[in-house]
Regions:
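Conserved short beta-strand edge segments in small beta-sheet-based binding/regulatory domains
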Residues: 82-90, 115, 119-134
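Short Lys/Arg-rich basic patches
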Residues: 1-10
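Helix N-cap motif at beta-to-alpha junctions
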Residues: 65-66, 103-110
Length: 138
């Protein structure tokens, strides 16, 4: 781990009060830890924006009774198997499934996969959760 460096941040009283409330609600041990998380979050967003190597999760909710839906989703995943680290399939009820697809690759390729999966008829919801490979977060 890198050596920690102290520096000052100037904030308005109201903004600091709201930040302190957020810190308490989320259970951070200190302002510093919360601030580090905010910085890391911004760095992850920037990695995704610049199109570098990223990690993340694509989540899908779908009705598995829709004709050919499961086969179509599987085919799309096999077409880019090098992006997919792992998948988890969860039965929400008799009709609906949740699929979580862990991915790693170039941001544009991950977005394209997510868009392809979300656009399949029968997919009720699809989201992409951005994460980092951790290589640039220090």
């Amino acid at each position: 781990m890198n050596k920690l460096i102290r520096f000052g941040v100037s904030l308005g009283r109201d903004l600091l009060g709201r930040f302190d409330t957020l810190i308490a609600e989320r259970g951070y041990a200190s302002r510093s830890e919360a601030f580090r998380d905010l910085i890391r979050g911004s760095l992850v967003e920037e990695e995704w924006r610049k199109g570098g190597e990223v990690a993340g999760a694509i989540t899908l909710v779908y009705d598995h009774h829709k004709k050919d839906l499961v086969n179509r989703l599987t085919d799309l995943q096999h077409d880019v198997h090098d992006l997919i680290i792992s998948t988890q399939h969860i039965h929400l009820d008799h009709d609906h499934c949740l699929e979580i697809i862990a991915v790693r690759g170039r941001a544009a390729e991950v977005r394209q996969l997510a868009d392809s999966l979300r656009s399949v008829k029968g997919v009720l919801q699809g989201t992409v959760n951005m994460a980092s490979t951790g290589k640039k977060l220090g």
